[in-house]
């Protein structure tokens, strides 16, 4: 039984770098000295020695030899040429290395009939230089020598390979009509890479019957011309190509994945036209296509693509369809780049959309044509006009212009912080305070403008004004019941209601304040104005609090400061923008 250690001993104790044999077997805490304390305590100090650790396998050196042995024959396999005992086969594949022999299985359709009898009837006998590699190549050729594999190889359109071979390594350029119709090989590769999705969809949607019908029609109409043309190209450039292999994948999940990717890339419309998100086919109009070659112009490709379209339609109806952005059925169509910006703005601007439609009689209660008034109406008039909820829906709704109110606020602040009759230092101080206030206003006003930009004018603006007047009636009743000195103002700071109790504390009558455009900041000193705008900036955008309690100082009519403990209640509109602010003020005696 080991001794129980104190916390101080546990803290000072450090593990040994390497344990001895006894401590390792007994799972004891060993020490760095030899003999260790455990062995001395048990009188076996003469047997105390370090435990021998097992060496890691990758440090023993056995793995390098085995890996080097396995790599050597693989290098020899790639450099060993292939020879065939059959004369017919030897003429085609004997001088080629293994890499070229592997490419032979993807040869063009015109090369297949020349070597088809030898591939199917005569077995291949390889050179005994490398029996293992020869057996692999023999099995590879025998596995692809069936008629089914030949049909899959024939899926490559013959004109594609011939055109590639003709434009690849031929240095003698002639300006004949046939060569002028041949596209550049660099342009072909670029188009193939950009139109990857089209190739994938063609691979998945093209049936074997459609491919055979295309090849048979092509061979029957242009047999003599194509044979001579392709044979000449094969002699000049024997390099095979398989750029359009259209057989389906063996995995159903992989097929579904590529179909979904095709939906996203082909059937989705970009939000804004740009070279990065525009289809590559729109920029490559003169690329490799069946209509660019004269010897296949008689083929009806539109009729050939009809079964493919039916298959695509069935696939879309039988599986989930994925699309990003706006589809072809959307009202926002960005087919023409010059009109794209205007179309986007029309979608967001309800005024342009509804101007094309017949507005009809509209609301029988509210006549928007006669009630859209831009002239300023004092709050004293509106308070006398809307004394009940029924009055809001019966009488004329007078629109409120917030831009005009902000312009009036800016003019008031410039006059307040102008300081024309002050000294230079005081004038600079006033100007610095004005810049602070204007920066605070500029920080939240763009948010208000963006929220009201998509409104339907004047209907939405009148609706917001009706909501404000409706909320104002409720808060008036609440203030009358509480009998607390209160002031109500818009988000611009314009006072729209003041109780008689508050007027008595400040020395103003309610009519004096409500008969004109009167801002709350006229009752505040300079420091309180800056403090208010800092507070309003936080509640306007970031903090969505409904009530805040602060201390504030107001200036009465005689010019003296009166300290209040105030509570601000913020009423927001449908855009979460402060619409009405109710301030209840209790004087601090």
From Swiss-Prot:
Q: Which residues bind DNA?
A: 20-48
Positions with biased composition (Basic and acidic residues): 347-357
Origin, by domain of life?
A: Eukaryota
Describe the location of the PAS domain by residue ranges: 471-542
Report the principal subcellular site. nucleus
The reply on keyword Nucleus is yes
Residue ranges with Polar residues bias: 80-90
Can you tell me which family this protein belongs to? Belongs to the ERT1/acuK family.
Q: What is this protein called?
A: Glucose starvation modulator protein 1
Q: Which organism is it from?
A: Candida tropicalis (strain ATCC MYA-3404 / T1)
Q: List the lineage, top down.
A: Eukaryota, Fungi, Dikarya, Ascomycota, Saccharomycotina
């Amino acid at each position: 039984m080991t001794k129980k250690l104190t916390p101080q001993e546990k803290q000072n104790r450090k593990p040994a770098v390497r344990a001895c044999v006894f401590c390792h077997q007994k799972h004891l805490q060993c020490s760095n000295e030899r003999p260790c304390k455990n062995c001395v305590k048990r009188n076996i100090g003469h047997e105390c020695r370090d435990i021998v650790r097992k060496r890691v396998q990758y440090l023993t050196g056995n793995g390098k030899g085995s890996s080097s042995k396995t790599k050597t024959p693989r290098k020899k396999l790639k450099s060993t040429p292939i020879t065939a005992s059959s004369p017919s086969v030897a003429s085609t594949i004997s001088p080629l290395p293994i890499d070229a022999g592997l490419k032979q299985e993807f040869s063009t359709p015109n090369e297949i009939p020349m070597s088809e009898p030898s591939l199917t009837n005569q077995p291949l006998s390889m050179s005994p230089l490398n029996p293992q590699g020869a057996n692999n190549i023999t099995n590879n050729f025998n596995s692809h020598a069936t008629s089914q594999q030949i049909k899959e190889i024939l899926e490559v359109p013959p004109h594609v390979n011939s055109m590639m071979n003709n434009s690849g390594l031929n240095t003698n350029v002639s300006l004949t009509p046939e060569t002028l119709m041949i596209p550049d090989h660099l342009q072909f590769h670029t188009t193939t890479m950009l139109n990857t999705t089209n190739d994938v969809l063609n691979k998945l949607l093209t049936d074997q019957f459609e491919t055979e019908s295309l090849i048979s029609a092509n061979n029957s109409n242009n047999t003599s011309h194509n044979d001579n043309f392709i044979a000449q190209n094969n002699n000049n450039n024997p390099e095979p190509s398989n750029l359009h292999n259209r057989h389906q994948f063996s995995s159903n999940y992989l097929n579904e994945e590529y179909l979904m990717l095709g939906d996203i890339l082909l059937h989705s419309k970009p939000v804004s036209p740009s070279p990065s998100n525009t289809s590559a086919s729109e920029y490559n109009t003169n690329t490799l296509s069946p209509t660019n070659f004269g010897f296949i112009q008689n083929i009806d490709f539109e009729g050939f693509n009809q079964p493919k379209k039916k298959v695509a339609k069935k696939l879309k109806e039988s599986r989930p369809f994925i699309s990003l952005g706006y589809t072809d059925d959307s009202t926002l169509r960005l087919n023409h780049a010059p009109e794209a910006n205007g179309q986007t703005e029309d979608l967001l601007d309800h005024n342009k959309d509804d101007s094309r439609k017949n507005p009809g009689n509209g609301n029988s209660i509210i006549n928007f044509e006669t009630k859209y008034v831009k002239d300023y109406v004092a709050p004293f008039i509106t308070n006398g006009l809307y004394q009940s909820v029924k009055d809001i829906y019966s009488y004329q709704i007078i629109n409120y212009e917030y831009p005009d109110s902000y312009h009036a606020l800016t003019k008031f602040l410039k006059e307040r912080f102008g300081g024309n009759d002050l000294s230079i230092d005081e004038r600079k101080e006033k100007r610095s305070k004005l810049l602070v206030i204007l920066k605070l206003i500029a920080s939240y006003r763009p948010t208000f403008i963006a929220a009201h930009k998509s409104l339907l004018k004047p209907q939405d603006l009148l609706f917001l004004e009706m909501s404000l007047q409706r909320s104002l009636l409720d808060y008036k009743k609440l203030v009358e019941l509480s009998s607390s000195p209160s002031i109500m103002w818009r988000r611009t700071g314009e006072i729209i209601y003041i109780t008689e109790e508050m007027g008595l504390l400040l020395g103003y009558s309610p009519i004096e304040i409500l008969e004109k455009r009167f801002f709350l900041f006229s009752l505040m000193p300079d420091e309180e104005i800056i403090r208010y705008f800092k507070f309003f900036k936080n509640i306007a955008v970031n903090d969505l609090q409904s009530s805040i309690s602060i201390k504030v100082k107001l200036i009465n009519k005689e010019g003296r400061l009166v300290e209040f403990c105030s509570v601000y209640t913020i009423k927001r509109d449908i855009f979460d923008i402060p619409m009405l602010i109710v301030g209840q003020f209790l004087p601090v005696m």
